[in-house]
Regions:
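Bacterial Sec-dependent N-terminal signal peptides
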Residues: 1-21
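Zn2+-dependent metallopeptidase catalytic domains
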Residues: 18-159
Length: 159
């Protein structure tokens, strides 16, 4: 019962936070683009995850819909750079949740778990994406890749 009340409270906070500035969805003014922890509130996380997942999916869709022949740059490198906003939001959330958890943070964690699982499946089970990775992998010997590039290609192919 109390968990339902907490989740309802988080959802209400989420609705009101849509009207305020979300520090995850704006460029940080802190040195080196560091997170502005003093501006981050619990209600910012869920909308930030939603926006970041939508952005990451769009980046994956751009890779799979690219009409050009798959190359290391337009497929593997593009995958490596996709999801950076999601990585930032998730990195901050999971670390703060571990170091300074609360019932509200746990409610957010419960809400984002299925979203993150769905996104992970969206990438790992994406047949057109795998076909592009496979096409690059099959010509790896002729690409003159550096060791780190080859490792990245092999990791993407095997995952």
């Amino acid at each position: 019962m109390i968990r339902k009340v907490i989740i309802a409270g988080v959802m209400l906070a989420l609705i009101s936070s849509c009207k305020m500035e979300n520090p995850f969805l704006t460029e940080s003014k802190a040195p080196f683009g560091a997170p502005e922890f003093d501006k981050i509130k619990t209600e910012h996380y869920l909308p930030a995850f939603e926006a970041a997942i939508a952005e990451a999916k769009a980046e994956i869709d751009a890779i799979t819909s690219n009409p050009d022949e798959p190359t290391f740059e337009n497929t593997i490198e593009a995958m490596e750079y996709s999801g950076q906003t999601l990585n930032k939001v998730a990195g901050i959330f999971y670390n703060v949740n571990e170091a300074h958890t609360s019932d509200e943070m746990q409610a957010v964690a419960e809400a984002i778990a299925p979203m993150m699982t769905e996104y992970s499946m969206y990438v790992s089970l994406n047949a057109p994406l795998f076909e592009r990775v496979k096409a690059v992998y099959e010509k790896k010997d002729s690409l003159n890749l550096e060791k780190d590039q080859l490792k990245l290609l092999e990791d993407n192919y095997k995952s």
